[in-house]
């Protein structure tokens, strides 16, 4: 059962325990809207001691009826138009805030391609019911999530009982271990005239990386 939120427990929240900001100033309008909308869905969430936060559960159905717009999304190794493009920037920024406050990460996976707003290995992809970002509050006091996007920058700040950090600070580092040059793959298309080529997906550079947490 989810621990009950009480006034006494909320009074233990006395300051910031982590904060992380990413930029989306150059995003298309639909994506900008989705980032701000998704941020508003998790803003004000309280994660009680021992409780596991689920990003997908807080966001709810990612549909046009729910208010999300069309924007570019990663589908395998391609970028396609789809409902909810931009949601992964919010989950990735939240992942960084969770790492910096030493939350216990219960579920997280990186994108199939590098993202523009974070170094390789620092992101957290979410998709449907299959891919989620989940973390557990390891502290004896609740954690409050503040999330806000202003169409340029997305900030996620976590508040809690500052003494729970034990005077420690946490830094996250990404080290690129290899760079994979993009390849051009040509495939026959019966719908095109002979000798005509169409660029379906621009080649992108791949990376392998290691991520470290320093206390």
Residue ranges, per PLM feature:
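Well-ordered beta-sheet/strand-loop patches within structured domains
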Residues: 1-215
């Amino acid at each position: 059962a989810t621990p009950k939120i009480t006034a006494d427990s909320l009074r233990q929240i006395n300051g910031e325990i982590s904060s992380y900001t990413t930029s989306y100033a150059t995003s298309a309008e639909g994506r900008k809207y989705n980032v701000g909308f998704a941020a508003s869905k998790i803003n004000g969430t309280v994660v009680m001691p021992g409780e596991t936060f689920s990003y997908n559960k807080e966001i709810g159905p990612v549909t046009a009826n729910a208010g999300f717009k069309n924007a570019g999304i990663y589908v395998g190794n391609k970028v396609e138009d789809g409902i909810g493009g931009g949601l992964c920037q919010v989950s990735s920024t939240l992942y960084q805030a969770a790492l910096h406050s030493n939350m216990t990460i219960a579920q997280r996976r990186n994108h199939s391609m590098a993202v523009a707003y974070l170094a390789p290995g620092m992101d957290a992809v979410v998709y449907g019911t299959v891919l989620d970002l989940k973390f557990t509050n390891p502290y004896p006091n609740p954690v409050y999530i503040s999330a806000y996007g202003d169409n340029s920058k997305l900030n996620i700040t976590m508040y809690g009982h500052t003494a729970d950090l034990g005077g420690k600070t946490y830094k996250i580092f990404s080290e690129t271990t290899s760079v994979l040059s993009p390849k051009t793959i040509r495939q026959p298309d019966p719908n095109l005239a002979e000798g005509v080529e169409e660029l379906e997906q621009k080649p992108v550079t791949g990376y392998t990386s290691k991520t470290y947490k320093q206390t």
